[in-house]
């Protein structure tokens, strides 16, 4: 007997009454292929694309938690910590006509140091606040608050970060090293301040603005330390930090009340915007004073001082303090204000070298 081959298995099943197309799909759990049109109006299969992997997926869960507690994926804090350092270094370069090589070296060292110390500060903050963070919606998923990392693991990470930071600090002159060691005091006590005072942002300002004190002597040396420039510059950075961190604190004001956490956002309340205007005026006035004492040129005032004044006034006018997302959006934009002032000082330095002194 000669057996004829079946032309098509699918055609055979479809000719069989018990194997309709619907039955086949149901039997093997296959969904009909969906079609979609692309921008050229041609029909293409809507195939399932593989899920996209982020850079975090390259590391184990523990390393992902280490990166999370260090805020490695949120660089805004590093930029804000770095900005006062750049202002001070570049102002010293303007005053003493420093070489580009030395300025670049200092900017690089302070850049790495800012990343390390900001990361270490976040770990210290989370160690202090792990119980409070669990009560706040925005922070309850942090590694320590959620139990993803243990206290011992966080302390081990902190030890590595502080050791690396010390390695950066030891590249500087002895006077700047002493200043750097002194900065650890506000770094360590800041998390406790939100438990006892409505003004923890002031302590944060002393901490985050400290680069304005260290940058100048790091480049110029102890003998050339000019407090008539550095002091108003430091006050300018403190005012700026209190301003933008008050906006940041408005994100959590409802949860903070429940958790007994204090902040300038709660202290100022409905009067926050008038206070922010006062802080902005103080920042701009002291920034201009530092420029006057340093003999800065017109580029600094037109781009740096006036530019910062415009950005701050625009932010204060537009930010919705009752919208957490809007508060965070405007908070992040302060890093651009820091870049603007740094660029103004750098361009003023170049103008002095090639235009003012020519």
UniProtKB/Swiss-Prot annotation:
<keyword id="KW-0809">Transit peptide</keyword>
<dbReference type="InterPro" id="IPR039653">
    <property type="entry name" value="Prenyltransferase"/>
</dbReference>
<keyword id="KW-0999">Mitochondrion inner membrane</keyword>
<dbReference type="GO" id="GO:0008299">
    <property type="term" value="P:isoprenoid biosynthetic process"/>
</dbReference>
<feature type="transmembrane region" description="Helical">
    <location>
        <begin position="336"/>
        <end position="356"/>
    </location>
</feature>
<keyword id="KW-1133">Transmembrane helix</keyword>
<comment type="similarity">
    <text>Belongs to the UbiA prenyltransferase family.</text>
</comment>
<keyword id="KW-0831">Ubiquinone biosynthesis</keyword>
<dbReference type="GO" id="GO:0005739">
    <property type="term" value="C:mitochondrion"/>
</dbReference>
<protein>
    <recommendedName>
        <fullName>4-hydroxybenzoate polyprenyltransferase, mitochondrial</fullName>
        <ecNumber>2.5.1.39</ecNumber>
    </recommendedName>
</protein>
<comment type="function">
    <text>Catalyzes the prenylation of para-hydroxybenzoate (PHB) with an all-trans polyprenyl group. Mediates the second step in the final reaction sequence of coenzyme Q (CoQ) biosynthesis, which is the condensation of the polyisoprenoid side chain with PHB, generating the first membrane-bound Q intermediate.</text>
</comment>
<dbReference type="InterPro" id="IPR006370">
    <property type="entry name" value="HB_polyprenyltransferase-like"/>
</dbReference>
<feature type="transmembrane region" description="Helical">
    <location>
        <begin position="275"/>
        <end position="295"/>
    </location>
</feature>
<feature type="transmembrane region" description="Helical">
    <location>
        <begin position="154"/>
        <end position="174"/>
    </location>
</feature>
<dbReference type="InterPro" id="IPR030470">
    <property type="entry name" value="UbiA_prenylTrfase_CS"/>
</dbReference>
<keyword id="KW-0414">Isoprene biosynthesis</keyword>
<keyword id="KW-0812">Transmembrane</keyword>
<keyword id="KW-0808">Transferase</keyword>
<dbReference type="InterPro" id="IPR000537">
    <property type="entry name" value="UbiA_prenyltransferase"/>
</dbReference>
<dbReference type="GO" id="GO:0008412">
    <property type="term" value="F:4-hydroxybenzoate polyprenyltransferase activity"/>
</dbReference>
<comment type="pathway">
    <text>Cofactor biosynthesis; ubiquinone biosynthesis.</text>
</comment>
<feature type="transmembrane region" description="Helical">
    <location>
        <begin position="229"/>
        <end position="249"/>
    </location>
</feature>
<keyword id="KW-0496">Mitochondrion</keyword>
<dbReference type="Pfam" id="PF01040">
    <property type="entry name" value="UbiA"/>
</dbReference>
<keyword id="KW-0472">Membrane</keyword>
<dbReference type="GO" id="GO:0006744">
    <property type="term" value="P:ubiquinone biosynthetic process"/>
</dbReference>
<feature type="transmembrane region" description="Helical">
    <location>
        <begin position="76"/>
        <end position="96"/>
    </location>
</feature>
<dbReference type="InterPro" id="IPR044878">
    <property type="entry name" value="UbiA_sf"/>
</dbReference>
<dbReference type="GO" id="GO:0005743">
    <property type="term" value="C:mitochondrial inner membrane"/>
</dbReference>
<feature type="transmembrane region" description="Helical">
    <location>
        <begin position="107"/>
        <end position="127"/>
    </location>
</feature>
<feature type="transmembrane region" description="Helical">
    <location>
        <begin position="202"/>
        <end position="222"/>
    </location>
</feature>
<feature type="transit peptide" description="Mitochondrion">
    <location>
        <begin position="1"/>
        <end position="20"/>
    </location>
</feature>
